Amino acid sequence: MEILLNKGEGRSYWVLGDLYTFKATGKQTNGTLTVMHQVIKSQGGPPPHVHHREDEVFYIEEGRFAFLLGKDQKIFETGSFIYIPKGTMHTFKNIEDKPGRLLVTITPAGLEEFFYAIGTPAVDLHNPPPFDPAIIGKVVQLAKEHNMEVMIPEDQT
């Protein structure tokens, strides 16, 4: 089955204050891959984490991001490509003063279910819902159910 989407199309969710739009999901790709477009707010990004099942590929469409890969931090900007194999602790942060844009491919598919569970369907694509600190515990618990570990400092749990 082909997937044909125009700019802005796809299923969008607010995830920890950032906008994730799913372009291809496991249901559409027979479990092969998930593709999502992410708009990451200034200083936004996920907590450090490890995927035990999935590899991730990031293409920076716009912006500058600091990626922590294991113990190494590197800065990447528009046009950069980053492949992160499963088992690698990583995180990233938008270090610009404006939103940045990423195209992310995850293989195999399935991790979108985690994002659906921790996110909020995006009715308004410009204004995220207020941050609820209770989400942190939910993120840690649901990550375990999706073969991930999330490293949250104790003062934030």
Give the positions of each predicted feature.
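A short, N-terminal "cap"/entry segment at the start of jelly-roll beta-barrel domains
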Residues: 1-33, 125-157
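Short acidic-glycine-tyrosine-enriched beta hairpin
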Residues: 4-6, 71-89
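Conserved short histidine dyad/triad with adjacent acidic residue
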Residues: 21-22, 36-51
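Ligand-binding loop in jelly-roll beta-barrel domains
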Residues: 29, 86-112
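Residue-level recognition of specific faces of alpha-helices
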Residues: 32, 56-59, 114-117
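Hydrophobic small-molecule pocket/channel-lining residues, especially in calycin-type beta-barrels
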Residues: 44, 52, 65, 116, ...
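Glycine- and acidic-residue-biased ligand/ion/polar-headgroup-sensing regions
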Residues: 53-56, 60-65, 70
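A hydrophobic, small-residue-rich beta->alpha segment in the mid-to-C-terminal subdomain
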Residues: 113-126
